[in-house]
Amino acid sequence: MGELADLVVVPSQPPLAGGRRDRLAALLELAAADDVDGLRGALAEGGEEAAELADGVGLWYGRSKAYEARTPLMVAATYGSAGVVSLLVGLGGCVDVNRRPGADGATALHCAASGGSRNAVAVVKLLLAAGADPATPDSAGRFPADVILAPPASPDALGDLEVLLGRRRALAVATSVASGSSSPPLSSSPDEGNRSPSSRSSSLSPITVDRGKKEYPVDPTLPDIKSSVYASDEFRMFAFKVRPCSRAYSHDWTECPFVHPGENARRRDPRKHPYTAVPCPNFRRPGGCPSGDSCEFSHGVFESWLHPSQYRTRLCKEGAACARRICFFAHDEDELRHVPHNSGAGLLSPRASSSIDMTAAAALGLLPGSPTRHFAPPPVSPSAGSNGGAAAAHWLQGSRLRSSFNARDAAVDDLGMLLEWESQYLGALCLPPSSRPQPRLSAGLSIRPTIAPSNLEDMYASDMAMSPRFPNDQGHSVYSPAHKSALLNKLHQQKGLLSPVNTNRMYSPRALDPSSLAHSPFGGMSPRSPRTMEPTSPLSARVGAPATQRPSVGSPRNSSAWGTVGSPMGKVDWGVDSEELVRLRRPAQPGFGEDETDVSWVQSLVSNAELNGKRGEVQGMPGTSALMNRPDLNNQGDLLDQTVIGAWLEQMHLDQK
């Protein structure tokens, strides 16, 4: 650019009409619009007043909603008019780049830093090259670096402006902590502002302004995040920076274990939001993750490293010398958590779980019985060898109903194999532990590993060990011969509760329990019964099983029925007693006789079966010709059983008609 004399031409006519104020207003408009040619022409038409007009002061309506004293250079710097700024600073000494004409005492650098334009970085570079001083304050004592406004369209310009104008945040503490390990510091308080990544990676300027972290008064009500329940694995994984803070006053967020509005360390509850420890690829992009809280990936380093599958699964490099307030890693072998491969959750470390204050844990809702506890990780830890058996027994008691084998889960062909395996196992229980065989099921019968024959003994042993009825000194004698009958009773009771179809009692009329017939779907088909066509479900069968056993507790036949189970080849006699049938027909309470089920036809079937004990009489009954020719009926008892079943089915058919 040439000097001002190169722009001045001798006008052929007098200057344009209008006063000096109007001409300065026109120059300010041209400077705001970055009209280089128009500004050059306006200065040329000014003649001898061109120098005064180039550095003249006019009134400009700014952001303060008032007229402010501004020069064309200051207006051009505010709106990022790099062409006009280059023209004006090239005029030599005619334009003062450090001039402060207004009452606010702002310079051209103040206007460029607070303008928020896309070309703010280029304008600041032109002003600094022309001799602008970034250490000149305004009337309020603010430097150009204190009034920086980042352009919304280019957030990276913030760091460049800070470097050019000499502003540098004091990140020494955070940088030293982050460089020593992969565990980042806690998010800063809102007074520290937001900073882009480019501001941390840029180099230091010779002129630095050290502004440390805001000091807060000592708050004794803030909990210590490194002691008590706040340092436990349970709180760190499921409550740290998850629960909102209830304090309504300003305090240090880095010392508070709860989350605050707008905090970067905010986490989702892994018990309510099923996400993994894998970082989300869209979280750091402009606009954030479109899935929001429903995303299956972690949002931020705190969600990733405090996830139950990641927290304290590795050893810290500093070990016991670690000085971080919140560390994501274990500092010794006792704090190390072992996560199973088939589980998305983690296991509590022995030291952390034993050091939890139970009163505080109950208040925070971290105990297993708390209503707010929705997540229950498996309690067995490989590192906790001393209490692993008791924890495993406690877990098995809660999951037995979910993991036990059910008869309706198997095919019809597999029921015979199940009966054969059960008889072998009951026989093996009567043998000494050293000589017990290990029966195996066929590959076609799919039973979950939780009740495999190899660990069924341990399951019931741990169950009895956890019961208050068995003291600790009797833990080794649970499988003595004195406890065999109690164990067999427990096996059959659990089988009757878990299976809606009792496979051991469905093929013989001797196994017909009158109470079960009264409540069975076959008994409901009879028009004599008030329970006609009542739908049945597995739940009703399980609930009704203990009720059907109550009337026969004191029965002599029932009390001696287990006498023949001791042998592997023993057969249980589930025959129907006529006295029990009489008691069933008799009303239990006055006024309820009309609700009792009529089972008189069952007694008639049993009496017919006892009278027709001879083969000649059996042959005379209808529907038995096909049964007589079967080669698999070896004795008279089996033939009699099949005959009674046929008569029973015919009676049911007649009842339906």
UniProtKB/Swiss-Prot annotation:
Biased segments, Low complexity type: 176-206
Domain of life: Eukaryota
Zn finger spans (C3H1-type): 274-302, 311-333
Polar residues: bias regions: 549-562
Entry-linked Gene3D superfamilies: 3.30.1370.210, Ankyrin repeat-containing domain (1.25.40.20)
Matches recorded under SMART domains: ANK (SM00248), ZnF_C3H1 (SM00356)
UniProt-recorded name of the protein: Zinc finger CCCH domain-containing protein 50
GO MF annotation list: DNA binding; zinc ion binding
Organism this protein belongs to: Oryza sativa subsp. japonica
